[in-house]
């Protein structure tokens, strides 16, 4: 007697049944991968570069026409039209320069913000290098010179103070000598008076000395 094993029923809510249902779905419900579109900024940038190129060419033609009209007006003596033509030339040149900036950025593959940041960084690095060189020069050259000058100044001031002290000592010695001389002068006067008296006395009473 053969026994047959019946397959176990799969519950409807199991993950396996959900996967089999997904596989049995028609192809209309399966999403196909779509290519990712290009960035809108790149499209706008390409269109903008085309417009700038066209405007740049028209600006150059306008500059050429203004130059011809201004030259002809100056040749005929109509200075008002000549001035208007010169003004148009200047304005179109400014406009051409403004239009040439994005064209240059498109050709070099850079942006204006990148160029400005590069300029700022280069200027900042240049300032840092210059100030670093200046500070290193001050540290290596000027500070030792200032130190030696300060030492020389201190030495000179010490010499001046020593000379002042020596001068004061000399002044004290001179005053002491003057005081001593002032004290000796009355004694000299008294000795001079006694000497003069003795001379007068000898003149009145001469003394005769005999040889032996």
Curated annotation (Swiss-Prot):
Membrane topology: Multi-pass membrane protein
Cell location: Cell membrane
Transmembrane annotation, as ranges: 54-74, 79-99
GO cellular component: plasma membrane
Keywords: Cell membrane, Membrane, Transmembrane, Transmembrane helix
Annotated protein name in UniProt: Uncharacterized protein CPn_0440/CP_0313/CPj0440/CpB0456
Provenance organism: Chlamydia pneumoniae (Chlamydophila pneumoniae)
């Amino acid at each position: 007697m053969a026994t047959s094993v019946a397959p176990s029923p799969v519950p409807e809510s199991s993950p396996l049944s959900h996967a089999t249902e997904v596989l049995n779905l028609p192809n209309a419900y399966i999403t196909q991968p779509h290519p990712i579109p290009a960035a809108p900024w790149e499209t706008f940038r390409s269109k903008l570069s085309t417009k700038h190129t066209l405007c740049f060419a028209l600006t150059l033609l306008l500059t050429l026409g203004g130059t011809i009209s201004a030259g002809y007006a100056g040749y005929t003596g109509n200075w008002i039209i000549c001035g208007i033509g010169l003004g148009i030339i200047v304005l179109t040149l400014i406009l051409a320069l403004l239009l040439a900036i994005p064209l240059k950025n498109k050709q070099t593959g850079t942006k204006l913000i990148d160029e400005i940041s590069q300029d700022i960084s280069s200027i900042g690095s240049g300032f840092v290098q210059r100030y670093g060189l200046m500070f290193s020069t001050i540290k290596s050259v000027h500070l030792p010179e200032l130190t030696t000058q300060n030492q020389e100044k201190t030495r000179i001031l010490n010499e001046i103070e020593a000379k002042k002290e020596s001068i004061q000592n000399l002044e004290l010695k001179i005053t002491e000598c003057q005081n001593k001389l002032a004290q000796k002068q009355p004694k000299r006067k008294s000795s001079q008076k006694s000497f003069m008296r003795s001379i007068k006395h000898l003149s009145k009473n001469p003394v005769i000395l005999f040889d032996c």
